[in-house]
């Protein structure tokens, strides 16, 4: 769409003649150009912002020769599209069949409300999850500490002390039994020796008896 076509469409929408539509378009463009030239910005809510941007000095290259060329600092006109304009072009917002395509304070306010509500809900949910998980972790860390500090080592220590005592008493009993057995073994040969000695004396009596008979 060029300027002439724009004027034709504007003439139909306004229901006026072509001269008035042409004057309206030219006055709008003239006002924007003069404001941006001064350094001001022209904001049309929902549509966009016309502004001036400052570019610093830089080094560029000539595309034909390839030589480096120094570019002086300059000012460049720029246009930033508005939120509603972007939404309509991207398809996020429906374009109405009749009436203005961009309304003042409709798309922008709705977008801001959605942006504010969504992070708030996520933050509250994250805070609740953190609050519920934190005590559980503390309890999990405390419970093993108590068990390890009081019950488990005490039982093991008692068992460790009792079992050697039993083993020692058993060992003492075994040694006592062995000692008594050894004493009995040493005493038994003495009796045998005592029994054998009278056996040697018996033949002497027999000899004396034989002598008396003779």
From Swiss-Prot:
Disruption phenotype: Essential it cannot be deleted; upon depletion growth slows dramatically, nucleoids decompact, gene expression is altered. Keywords: Acetylation, Cytoplasm, DNA condensation, DNA-binding, Iron, Iron storage, Oxidoreductase, Phosphoprotein, Repeat, Transcription, Transcription regulation. It holds the Pfam family Bac_DNA_binding. GO terms for molecular function: DNA binding; oxidoreductase activity; structural constituent of chromatin. Its EC number is 1.16.3.1. The modification N6-acetyllysine is found at residues 3, 72, 86, 103, 116, 133, 146, 167. GO terms for cellular component: cytosol; nucleoid. It catalyses: 4 Fe(2+) + O2 + 4 H(+) = 4 Fe(3+) + 2 H2O. Induction: Transcribed in early log phase, decreases in mid-log, and rises into late-log and early stationary phase. Protein levels rise as cells enter stationary phase (at protein level). It is found in: Cytoplasm, Nucleoid. Residues 100-214 are annotated as: Disordered. Gene3D superfamilies: IHF-like DNA-binding proteins. PROSITE patterns: HISTONE_LIKE. Phosphorylated in vivo on Ser and Thr-residues; the protein is degraded during purification so most sites were not identified, but at least one of Thr-43 and/or Thr-45 are modified in vivo. In vitro at least PknE, PknF and PknB phosphorylate HupB; PknE is the most active and phosphorylates many sites in vitro including Thr-43 and Thr-45. Acetylated on 8 Lys residues in vivo (probably by Eis). In vitro acetylated by Eis on 28 residues (strains H37Rv and H37Ra), many more than those identified in vivo. Also acetylated by MRA_0812. Deacetylated in vitro by NAD-dependent protein deacylase NPD (MRA_1161). The modification Phosphothreonine is found at residues 43, 45. Changing residue 86 to A: Reduced binding of DNA and inhibitors SD1 and SD4. Two trans-stilbene derivatives, 4,4'-[(E)-ethene-1,2 diylbis({5[(phenylcarbonyl)amino]benzene-2,1-diyl}sulfonylimino)] dibenzoic acid and its methoxy derivative 4,4'-[1,2-ethenediylbis({5-[(4-methoxybenzoyl)amino]-2,1phenylene}sulfonylimino)] dibenzoic acid, respectively SD1 and SD4, inhibit DNA binding with 50% inhibition at 20 uM for SD1 and 1.7 uM for SD4. SD1 and SD4 have minimal inhibitory concentrations of 400 and 800 uM on strain H37Ra respectively. Changing residue 55 to A: Reduced binding of DNA and inhibitors. Inhibition of Top1 at high concentrations is reduced. The modification N6-succinyllysine is found at residues 3, 113, 142. InterPro entries: Hist_DNA-bd, Histone-like_DNA-bd_CS, IHF-like_DNA-bd_dom_sf. GO terms for biological process: chromosome condensation; intracellular iron ion homeostasis. It is an enzyme of class 1 (oxidoreductase). Belongs to the bacterial histone-like protein family. Long actinobacterial subfamily. Oligomerizes. Homodimer; the crystallized protein is missing the C-terminal 105 residues. Interacts with topoisomerase 1 (topA). Interacts with Eis. Interacts with NAD-dependent protein deacylase NPD (MRA_1161). Interacts with MRA_0812 CoA transferase. The N-terminus (residues 1-108) is stable, binds DNA and is phosphorylated in vitro by PknE, PknF and PknB. This fragment binds DNA less well when phosphorylated by PknE. Residues 1-100 stimulate Top1 and physically interact with it. The N-terminus (residues 1-40) forms an intertwined dimer, while residues 44-83 form a beta-saddle which probably contacts DNA. This is DNA-binding protein HupB. It comes from Mycobacterium tuberculosis (strain ATCC 25177 / H37Ra).
């Amino acid at each position: 769409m060029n300027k002439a076509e724009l004027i034709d469409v504007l003439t139909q929408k306004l229901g006026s003649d072509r001269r008035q539509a042409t004057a309206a378009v030219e006055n709008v463009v003239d006002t924007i150009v003069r404001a941006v030239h001064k350094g001001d910005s022209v904001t049309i809510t929902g549509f966009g912002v016309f502004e001036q941007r400052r570019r610093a000095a830089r080094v560029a290259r000539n595309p034909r020769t390839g030589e480096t060329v120094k570019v002086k600092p300059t000012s460049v006109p720029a246009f930033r599209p508005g939120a509603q304009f972007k939404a309509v072009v991207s398809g996020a917002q429906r374009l109405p069949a009749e009436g203005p395509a961009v309304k003042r304070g409709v798309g922008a306010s709705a977008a801001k409300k959605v942006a504010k509500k969504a992070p708030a809900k996520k933050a509250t949910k994250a805070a609740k999850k953190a609050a519920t998980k934190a005590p559980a972790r503390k309890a999990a860390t405390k419970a093993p500490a108590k068990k390890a500090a009081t019950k488990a080592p005490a039982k093991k220590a008692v068992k460790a002390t009792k079992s050697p005592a039993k083993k020692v008493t058993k060992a003492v009993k075994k040694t006592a039994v062995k000692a008594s057995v050894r004493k009995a073994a040493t005493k038994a040969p003495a009796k045998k020796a005592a029994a054998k000695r009278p056996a040697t004396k018996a033949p002497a009596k027999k000899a004396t008896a034989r002598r008396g008979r003779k």
